[in-house]
């Protein structure tokens, strides 16, 4: 039994923002209120004075790499990293080896999660067999076994007709399709955003137009099929405009942005550091500002990480040879608080909405709310705690982080999953 006292409860789903107490018993929230007590019972008291007490953060886009790529990350280390970052639930993508394109692989992954997961994990099935965009995956069987959505993330579904069929099928199953929207005929040979910085560096670029074309196509297909399309990791200001216009027309669409695209721009790549290499790439400061405006007006629904760790030796190579992707679970909240809360004036309520409430709604999973009777998935946040990021101190297997040596402001100081403290003051306890 836990009694969280004197914390500021931030519970946007219930329009609640007040200093109060939470009693947790048998893995669930038993009571919330000023006069809550556990008289006569053995209870661990947590003094949360000066802290925000929020629904557990939910990251709807991570790559845990298991099975098949455990040298990069595995379910245990990836969920340890999640706990360290205040995340109580993640959704893992299908680009494992073998690909999660059938119910047998999905069940195997869920078994592994049950054995070693530190936080909760939902599984996203692939759209196509082996991520090749040619044959539909076993979407119906995977939906029956608990797949929360479908995505070939890391790969763009090139054929519009194939994507149409996939969306029609997913819509029948009541599932969302998540697309990595970059037209690879334009972007496939690029290493960073195409623009002034890439020209000065002499590096082949990935034009934002490639993203815009893909986003426009996906929105049109959603309008045609009625299927919920979720645009992964939007990075282009023009793409945000397209999504805003589609939402105004009633198209069934949503989108997300990574914390790193809100913090960094392509200017950070001037020293050819592979830690900043990702897809879609970091874009201009104008794009970054457009992403922030998209969050302000509700065009962008969620903040996530696209946690995509690689082996250290894979990243410690010349820039053009390094794979795309960074580890982000342990820095996402702090990066977001630094930029949005401390610099842009976002309320903590809005940030919790973007990092917990909305991801739960989009994935159709429990979470995003603090109320009596629900699982006690809770994050305690110190918004003013300053800390310096060092890759060697992180729980993820990937030591390369674009935040290396940077001081961020704000940090999760406790993570509770089903009433159990899994992280306290930066130390993961499982």
What residue ranges belong to the model's regions?
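Histidine-rich, glycine-flanked metal-binding segment
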Residues: 1-55
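Metal-associated gating/positioning segment near the N- to mid-region
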Residues: 49-113
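Alpha-helix-loop-beta-strand connector modules within alpha/beta enzyme cores
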Residues: 54, 103-120, 168-179, 331, ...
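His/Asp/Glu-enriched, well-ordered alpha-helical/loop segment
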Residues: 200-228, 275, 296, 301-303, ...
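C-terminal cap of metal-dependent C-N hydrolases
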Residues: 7, 318-321, 342, 375-430
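Histidine/acidic residue-rich metal-binding segments in metalloenzymes
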Residues: 134-303
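Active-site mouth loops of central-metabolism enzymes
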Residues: 60-73, 122-135, 204-208
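Divalent metal-coordination and catalytic microenvironments
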Residues: 7, 22, 27, 50, ...
């Amino acid at each position: 039994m836990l009694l969280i006292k004197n914390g500021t409860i931030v519970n946007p789903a219930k329009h609640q923002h007040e200093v109060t107490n939470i009693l947790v018993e048998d893995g669930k929230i038993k009571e919330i209120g000023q006069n809550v007590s556990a008289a006569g019972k053995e209870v661990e008291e947590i003094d949360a004075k000066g802290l925000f007490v929020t629904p557990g953060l939910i990251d709807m886009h991570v790559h845990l790499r298991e099975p098949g790529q455990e040298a990069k990350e595995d379910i245990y280390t990836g969920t340890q990293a999640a706990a360290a970052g205040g995340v109580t639930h993640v959704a893992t993508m299908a680009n494992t080896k073998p690909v999660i394109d059938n119910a047998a692989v999905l069940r195997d992954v869920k078994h592994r999660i049950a054995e070693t997961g530190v936080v909760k994990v939902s599984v996203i099935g692939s759209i196509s067999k082996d991520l090749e965009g040619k044959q539909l995956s076993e979407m119906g069987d995977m939906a029956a076994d608990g797949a929360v959505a479908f995505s070939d993330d890391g790969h763009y579904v090139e054929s519009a007709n194939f994507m149409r069929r996939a969306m029609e099928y997913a819509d029948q199953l009541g599932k969302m399709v998540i697309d990595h929207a970059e037209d690879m005929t334009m972007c496939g040979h690029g290493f960073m955003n195409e623009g002034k910085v890439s020209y000065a560096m002499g590096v082949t670029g990935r034009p934002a137009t490639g993203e815009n074309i893909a986003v426009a196509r996906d929105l049109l297909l959603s309008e045609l099929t009625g299927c919920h399309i979720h645009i992964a990791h939007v990075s282009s200001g023009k793409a945000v405009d397209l999504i805003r216009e589609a939402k105004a027309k009633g198209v069934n669409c949503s989108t997300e942005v990574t914390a790193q695209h809100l913090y960094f721009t392509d200017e950070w790549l001037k020293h050819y550091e592979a830690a900043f290499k990702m897809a879609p790439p970091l874009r201009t400061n104008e794009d970054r500002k457009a992403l922030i405006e998209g969050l302000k007006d509700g065009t962008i629904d969620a903040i996530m990480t696209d946690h995509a760790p690689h082996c250290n030796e894979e990243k410690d190579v010349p820039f053009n040879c390094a794979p795309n992707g960074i580890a982000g679970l342990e820095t996402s909240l702090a990066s977001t608080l630094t930029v949005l809360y401390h610099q842009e004036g976002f309320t903590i309520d809005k940030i919790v909405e973007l990092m917990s409430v909305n991801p739960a709604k989009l994935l159709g999973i429990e979470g995003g709310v603090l109320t009596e009777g629900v699982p006690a998935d809770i994050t305690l946040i110190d918004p003013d705690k300053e800390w310096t990021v060092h890759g060697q101190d992180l729980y993820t297997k990937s030591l390369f982080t674009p935040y290396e040596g940077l001081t961020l402001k704000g940090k999760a100081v406790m993570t509770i999953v089903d009433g159990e403290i899994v992280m306290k003051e930066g130390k993961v306890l499982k």
